[in-house]
Structures are given as structure tokens and as C-alpha cells.
């Protein structure tokens, strides 16, 4: 396979072959080149074109780009643009709109009207109308980041553990219930607003490594694990068009 898709997130590095206008089988690693041993680096694919999207810090992005440049004839870095593949970004300055959010919207274009919720280091929420117009969104801490922040300020509060219950009777469950519940409430409120604003039913798509624990609390949501990579595939297909 000569064309590959690479997504460097804040916490994970994922890649997949480009199959038509979709991502193929996804592989994921802990963060970036510094988190991958020599055997893992040697197993990275090679080919003609690597399409790369990164929201990671330059210290993590640059070594991975250098690694890919040794394996591919071309390495193409994706940037957010005002319009692509029928999606129009609402930001006055599209360069300030995260490329992961941009690609998630490209991946969700066929599901519009849709609310896209990404759960990783951050919780991102974006609304896309049936006409491809982005109606804005929100950014908050994800449940994992909430837990880590609480633990950093109050070490007696564990950074993980516990189950979701509506009214917890121990600290671990209370933390999970509070942080997961806060994320779910923000998603639900945003979905309600989107449906009132657009005047039509709006689908809910959820993606990201932190999404699975929230899915039982969002029964109407569809989980799309490879949404950003699918969006990257859409971008690559559009870029290849004359």
C-alpha cells in the first residue's frame, strides 16, 4: 500500500492505510516516536505518500515527521482550511480551529446534521448542518483530564478508578460519576441546543480514546473509532482531485 494516514493526537499516535476514501485497519501506539521502541519504529509502513495530521506538541511531532520522511517519498501535513469536501468552518480564522476537529467534521459529513463529540485529552463538541456548514462548538476538559487535574491539586483524590452511579456513596465512584456526568451533560445540552437551533433531529457521533466509558450514558450515540482518520482520508482524496 503506497498511501497511509497518520493521526498524532495529544495522547495517542494512530495510523491506517488509505482505502479509497476511507481509512483501513487502524493501529495505535502510545504517544509519538519517543514512546515507541526500536521494533515498533521499524514496523512503521513505508510508501509513496504519508498524510499527517497532528495536534501534538512540536517536540513530539517533529521526530515522527522525520521518521516518516525516511519511509515515504512525500509527507503531506494537513492544515485546517475554511472549506473542504463540502464542509465550511465557522471560525473567522480557520487556522485556529484544531485539525483534529476539522478532520472529524470531514469524516462526519455524510451523517449531517450531526453533533460530533471527541473525547481525548480534551472534550470537543462541534455541530455540522446538513448543508455542510459548521455551526461552532465547545472545548472542555475530558473526564480523564478532570480526574488528573483534581489529583494534581489534591493527591488524596485518585486519578482513576470508580464506577458511574447517579448518587455515589464512596469517593472513587463519586469522582467517576461527577467527571463522566459533566461530560455527558455538556454533550446532551449541546445536542439539545443544536436541535432547537437547526430545527431538525441531529445525530450524535462520538469518537476518541476516552469515549467508550461514556457510551452507556449516551444511548443514542454512534461510536466511530476512526472518525479523524476517515476525515483524513476524505482530505487526501480531495487533495488528489484535479
UniProtKB/Swiss-Prot annotation:
Subcellular location: Cytoplasm
Chief place where the protein resides: cytoplasm
Pathway(s) the chain acts in: Cofactor biosynthesis; coenzyme A biosynthesis; CoA from (R)-pantothenate: step 1/5
Enzyme class of the recorded protein, top EC level: transferase
List of residues binding ATP: 7-14, 121
Keywords: ATP-binding, Coenzyme A biosynthesis, Cytoplasm, Kinase, Nucleotide-binding, Potassium, Transferase
GO cellular component: cytoplasm
Top-rank lineage group of the source organism: Bacteria
Molecular function per GO: ATP binding; pantothenate kinase activity
Calcium keyword on record: no
Family annotation (CDD domains): ASKHA_NBD_PanK-III (cd24015)
Active site annotation, chain numbering: 100 (proton acceptor)
Positions of substrate binding: 91, 98-101, 171
Cofactor(s), names only, from the UniProt record: NH4(+); K(+)
InterPro entries: ATPase_NBD (IPR043129), Type_III_PanK (IPR004619)
GO BP, one annotated term: coenzyme A biosynthetic process
Chemical reaction(s) catalysed: (R)-pantothenate + ATP = (R)-4'-phosphopantothenate + ADP + H(+)
EC number: 2.7.1.33
Cofactor note: A monovalent cation. Ammonium or potassium.
Subunit structure: Homodimer.
PANTHER family per the UniProt record, alphabetical: TYPE III PANTOTHENATE KINASE (PTHR34265:SF1)
Functional summary from the UniProt entry: Catalyzes the phosphorylation of pantothenate (Pan), the first step in CoA biosynthesis.
Name of the protein in its database record: Type III pantothenate kinase
